[in-house]
Design a protein with these regions (language model features):
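Iron-sulfur-associated redox domains of electron-transfer enzymes in respiratory
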Residues: 1-128
């Protein structure tokens, strides 16, 4: 799939372990050529080039570490439709603010059980 047709993925990258897991999963989607990560801070900050990219007719996936949904909120604030929104806390990911590293077993479980199905839904144009 060409880069300009891949889903765009926006992730939380806050200070908790759950946020860092969301960011790591978005990076993995990009590294594996399954999606193109874009800058949620740029969308939230109203940066014209990043708003232009976010408004492209491509599926959008948001990956948030917790129920605050900051990545999703940044896009919605700009009236950008999110195709699939993932809240990792709804899938058993606990938010730790103690500087804990990402648990590789948890990352793999979430990848298989949550991220791959979310990607399939986004590619099918199914809102989830």
């Amino acid at each position: 799939m060409k880069v300009n047709t891949l889903p765009l993925v926006y992730s939380c990258s806050g200070c908790s372990s759950a946020a860092q897991l969301a960011n790591a999963l978005a990076l993995r989607l990009t590294r594996e050529g399954l999606a193109e990560m874009s800058c949620v801070a740029g969308v939230g900050g109203g940066v014209p080039a990043l708003l232009g990219r976010a408004r492209q007719p491509r599926p959008k996936i948001t990956l948030d570490g917790c129920a605050l949904g900051c990545a999703r909120a940044c896009l919605e604030r700009e009236h950008i439709d999110v195709t699939v929104s993932v809240d990792l806390s709804r899938h058993g990911v606990r938010k730790r603010r103690d500087g804990s590293l990402i648990d590789p077993d948890e990352a793999e479980r979430v990848w298989d059980a949550v991220i791959i199905p979310a990607l399939a839904a986004a590619n099918a144009g199914v809102s989830a």
